[in-house]
């Protein structure tokens, strides 16, 4: 079996991949993650997932390289990582009582064959009505400034949800394991 490499520095993705109990290593790809003019969010996450995986092929022959990227979409607007309290407050205020769709791009690149499987897995979060005090308490408690949509679904962020909708809850955290297992099996990897 080719070695498995996660093209990410995300601790969330690393923790998710570890659930599969397969040996893997991690390496952070160096790519330009800028959105192209008029690029649809669906296309953006698939392109970035593929580029992250392909960026590591030169140094990693005979590897299956996993790339992933995620954006949150609210009212057809892409929400990036807030990086600050103020921006997170704006995002969660705008999302209050609405639905936020997370698009997670996933790529599995076989550096031996040059073949790449790419997909996008959507997951929708229906948010509760949130007042400013609730949002501020949440932000001070969890500081989700490195998360698209300004919350951590694997933590206290779940308290902001009214309901969720999607085929793979792990896609919300950044690595859709159900779809990844399909891709790995197609490459001949035994899971479990």
Curated annotation (Swiss-Prot):
UniProt catalytic activity: N(7)-methyl-GTP + H2O = N(7)-methyl-GMP + diphosphate + H(+)
EC number(s) given by UniProt: 3.6.1.-
Transmembrane regions listed in the UniProt entry: none
Residues annotated as the enzyme's active site: 69 (proton acceptor)
InterPro entries: ITPase-like_fam, Maf-like
MF (Gene Ontology): nucleoside triphosphate diphosphatase activity
UniProt record, GO biological process: nucleotide metabolic process
Localization per Swiss-Prot or TrEMBL: Cytoplasm
Keyword Cell division included in the entry's annotation: no
Listed cofactors: a divalent metal cation
Alphabetically ordered keywords of this record: Cytoplasm, Hydrolase, Nucleotide metabolism
Keyword Cell inner membrane: no
One term under GO cellular component: cytoplasm
A Pfam family it matches: Maf
Subcellular location, principal: cytoplasm
Function: Nucleoside triphosphate pyrophosphatase that hydrolyzes 7-methyl-GTP (m(7)GTP). May have a dual role in cell division arrest and in preventing the incorporation of modified nucleotides into cellular nucleic acids.
Family: Belongs to the Maf family. YceF subfamily.
Name of the protein: 7-methyl-GTP pyrophosphatase
Source organism: Pseudomonas syringae pv. syringae (strain B728a)
């Amino acid at each position: 079996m080719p070695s498995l490499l996660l093209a990410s520095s995300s601790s969330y993705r690393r923790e998710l991949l570890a659930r599969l109990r397969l040996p893997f290593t991690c390496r952070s790809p160096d790519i330009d993650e800028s959105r192209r003019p008029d690029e649809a969010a669906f296309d953006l996450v698939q392109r970035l997932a593929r580029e992250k995986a392909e960026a590591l092929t030169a140094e990693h022959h005979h590897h299956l390289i996993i790339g992933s990227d995620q954006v949150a979409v609210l009212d057809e607007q892409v929400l990036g990582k807030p990086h600050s309290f103020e921006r997170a407050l704006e995002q969660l205020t705008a999302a209050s009582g609405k639905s936020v769709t997370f698009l997670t791009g996933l790529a599995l690149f076989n550096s031996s064959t040059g073949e790449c499987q790419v997909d996008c897995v959507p997951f929708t979060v229906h948010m509760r009505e949130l007042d400013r005090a609730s949002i501020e308490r949440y932000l001070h408690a969890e500081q989700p400034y490195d998360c698209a949509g300004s919350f951590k679904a694997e933590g206290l962020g779940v308290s902001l949800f009214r309901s969720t909708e999607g085929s793979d809850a792990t896609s919300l955290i950044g690595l859709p394991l159900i779809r990844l297992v399909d891709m790995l099996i197609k490459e001949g990897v035994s899971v479990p």
